[in-house]
């Protein structure tokens, strides 16, 4: 009889991970090269196998890239996130915590600056649209 409390881990290959996360397999390999992602294991045939939950990680990386963060910044944020999720603060001294806080505060400032620039662009587009609508003959 099967134990209902046991979690059966599902593994997916690089193509399926890429498809689910809406990126290319080449992007997945690039993230691996940058240390952002690694396969759970490789088969004897050399196929990379990933845990199904890596889809969310790839989507988060893509989202942060789209928001203007470099892969280096994304990696640092993911490392901090891992410490928070695993609650392993006993392995981190106050000096390291201060570095993390400073880094995240600088990322927050950059995000606010990008957001303000995006709002300005949006307002400019809205003004041009309204101007053009007023010029229509019909």
Give the residues covered by each predicted segment:
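Append "Primarily bacterial transcriptional regulators
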Residues: 17-18, 31, 50
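Arg/Lys-rich, alpha-helical DNA-contact motif
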Residues: 2-9, 53-138
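Polyanion-binding surface elements
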Residues: 10-27
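Alpha-helical residues within the helix-turn-helix
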Residues: 19, 33, 76
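Short helix-start
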Residues: 41-59
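DNA major-groove recognition helix of helix-turn-helix
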Residues: 28, 32, 65
